[in-house]
Amino acid sequence: MSIYFSGLMAPLDKNNVDTDQIIPKQFLTSTSREGFDAALFYDWRYLENDEPNPDFILNRPCYQGAQILLTRDNFGCGSSREHAPWALKQYGFEVILAESFADIFFNNCGNNQMLAIALPGDTLEQLFVLSEQHDDIHIDIDLENQTLTSTKFAPISFDIRKDVKERLLSGLDFIGVTETLNPQIDAFEQQLAAERPWQ
């Protein structure tokens, strides 16, 4: 088995988590991709006095350092903001497990080297039940063979688009993928110039 990633899973038992809940709009003041981790889930993580909310799941000591987020349906819905995956990744999340993702958010995850895995609702429900019984669920992710494994559950298979999988395995974003095609692009331009010298 080829392990792409291993990490601790933290459960966020909420449907329809939109990008404004992931990172509220008042924190969208920079395009540097840095410093957004403190604002992640701000309205849930903090009380009115900016003290950590002890009732919020990610503030529990057992989930400090979690790198896999388990959540529900339609994660990342709402307005398009790449700051949302930036905040998640800077906080430490590398993988998100959900029943479905908003399309733009899903693509932004891939562009930022985050693995977003859509799982059937019954599979997610089993993982949430397990998370109520155990707060130390570590998952090994074999991206090549598209499986999740753990000492707490039987192997789980998942689907992923081929282009997303290849980009994650290669570590390339869209620009990097385009640069790998430079020889073909150069050859096409030379051929076009020869066939249409008037252009």
From Swiss-Prot:
Q: Which InterPro entries match?
A: 3-IsopropMal_deHydase_ssu (IPR004431), Aconitase/3IPM_dehydase_swvl (IPR015928), AconitaseA/IPMdHydase_ssu_swvl (IPR000573), IPMI_Swivel (IPR033940), LeuD (IPR050075)
According to its UniProt entry, the protein's GO biological process terms are: L-leucine biosynthetic process
* Keywords carried by this UniProt record: Amino-acid biosynthesis, Branched-chain amino acid biosynthesis, Leucine biosynthesis, Lyase
Tree of life domain: Bacteria
Asked if the record carries the keyword Lyase, the reply is yes
EC numbers, comma separated: 4.2.1.33
Gene3D superfamilies xref list: Aconitase, domain 4
GO cellular component annotations of the record = 3-isopropylmalate dehydratase complex
The enzyme class is: lyase
- What GO terms are given for molecular function? 3-isopropylmalate dehydratase activity
- Cystine bridges: none
Catalytic reactions on record: (2R,3S)-3-isopropylmalate = (2S)-2-isopropylmalate
Q: Which family does it belong to?
A: Belongs to the LeuD family. LeuD type 1 subfamily.
According to its UniProt entry, what is the function of this protein?
A: Catalyzes the isomerization between 2-isopropylmalate and 3-isopropylmalate, via the formation of 2-isopropylmaleate.
Protein name per the record: 3-isopropylmalate dehydratase small subunit
- What organism, scientifically named, is this protein from? Pseudoalteromonas translucida (strain TAC 125)
